[in-house]
UniProtKB/Swiss-Prot annotation:
Belongs to the sugar phosphate cyclases superfamily. Dehydroquinate synthase family. GO terms for biological process: amino acid biosynthetic process; aromatic amino acid family biosynthetic process; chorismate biosynthetic process. InterPro entries: Dehydroquinate_synthase, DHQ_synth_AroB, DHQ_synth_fam, DHQS/DOIS_N, DHQS_C. It is an enzyme of class 4 (lyase). It comes from Escherichia coli (strain K12). PANTHER family: 3-DEHYDROQUINATE SYNTHASE (PTHR43622), 3-DEHYDROQUINATE SYNTHASE, CHLOROPLASTIC (PTHR43622:SF7). This is 3-dehydroquinate synthase. The lineage of its organism: Bacteria, Pseudomonadati, Pseudomonadota, Gammaproteobacteria, Enterobacterales.
Length: 362
């Protein structure tokens, strides 16, 4: 069992990583006997895990209600958020309730925002079931829903009480979702840890076949890196912005193509190549290192080009609505070397468009 602590003073919390955690009531601390829980999951995961998690919580004396959401990025919306509020109010659940997010990034982000908002804030626990949510979205307290004009535009910083990562969930993950999660894994190597990127080049095949020790190390290292960044910059005023490598471009793809048509990790993968091409055009990143990124992404089964039907010009309106924009100016996360990156302002729109075009025709 691996245990990492996100250090945020009184709001510090553990990330527990192991197989078989759904069999142990102690995995879901700080829940105690007699407490009330709203378990939030989706229609795909409910048949796989709902009864199991409900059973282990009830075994611990917890009173469990549940709400099952539709599955897909397009349902990460205000309308679906309202169904969670309605379920909480109908039971009813008070300010002492705990929301448990059992699912991937959509369930986790939406449930976290519900917890941040319901009666001005109730406790919640993240139980991520996808690789992407286990290595990234469940850690750090970013919660949100989407708007038709932009991804994650309505949300709050709100930390969970704990994160429970059961590696067994990956056994039911579709290959496309596994690849999507690997995009965020590769991101950590590019922006923060060149040695980890090297390890990924050597061990990617083991991750693709869900080798237990390799996957446990991979998830632990990603969570360690994320925890360090969040502890240093919880509200993304500086260092934490680096975690958005590829996301400014990727969110544009998701919004333009319709949420759910491109998985988040797929869009981020293409976006990371666009960021690398931008950095190349600025003369601060080598084409050889861009090729290393492209090769690893392709091995993971990820796209390295944007959608053919989306012109370079179509990216700009979305990118100019990005949450990192300051005083009307785009701020891009750009690699300087494998393992080192920066937040860069003042890059001309023409250069960015040319970098995007490089990835459309490649």
């Amino acid at each position: 069992m691996e245990r990492i602590v996100v250090t945020l003073g009184e709001r510090s919390y553990p990330i527990t990583i192991a197989s078989g955690l759904f069999n142990e009531p102690a995995s879901f601390l700080p829940l105690k006997s007699g407490e009330q829980v709203m378990l939030v999951t989706n229609e795909t995961l409910a048949p796989l895990y709902l009864d199991k998690v409900r059973g282990v919580l009830e075994q611990a004396g917890v009173n469990v209600d549940s709400v099952i959401l539709p599955d897909g990025e397009q349902y990460k919306s205000l309308a679906v958020l309202d169904t969670v509020f309605t379920a909480l109010l109908q039971k009813p659940h008070g300010r002492d309730t705990t929301l448990v997010a059992l699912g991937g990034g959509v369930v986790g982000d939406l449930t976290g925002f519900a917890a941040a908002s319901y009666q001005r804030g109730v406790r919640f626990i993240q139980v991520p079931t996808t690789l992407l949510s286990q290595v990234d979205s469940s850690v750090g307290g970013k919660t949100a829903v989407n708007h038709p004009l932009g991804k994650n535009m309505i949300g709050a910083f709100y930390q969970p009480a704990s994160v429970v990562v059961d590696l067994d969930c990956l056994k039911t993950l579709p290959p496309r979702e596994l690849a999507s999660g690997l995009a965020e894994v590769i991101k950590y190597g590019i922006i923060l840890d060149g040695a980890f990127f090297n390890w990924l080049e050597e061990n990617l095949d083991a991750l693709l076949r869900l080798d237990g020790p390799a996957m446990a190390y991979c998830i632990r290292r990603c969570c360690e890196l994320k925890a360090e960044v969040v502890a240093a910059d919880e509200r993304e005023t500086g260092l934490r912005a680096l975690l958005n490598l590829g996301h400014t471009f990727g969110h544009a793809i998701e919004a333009e193509m319709g949420y759910g048509n491109w998985l988040h990790g797929e869009a981020v993968a293409a976006g990371m190549v666009m960021a690398a091409r931008t950095s190349e055009r600025l003369g601060q990143f080598s084409s050889a290192e861009t090729q290393r990124i492209i090769t690893l992404l392709k091995r993971a089964g990820l796209p390295v080009n944007g959608p053919r039907e989306m012109s370079a010009q179509a990216y700009l309106p979305h990118m100019l609505r990005d949450k990192k924009v300051l005083a009307g100016e785009m701020r891009l996360i750009l690699p300087l070397a494998i393992g080192k990156s920066e937040v860069r302002s003042g890059v001309s729109h023409e250069l960015v468009l040319n970098a995007i075009a490089d990835c459309q025709s490649a």
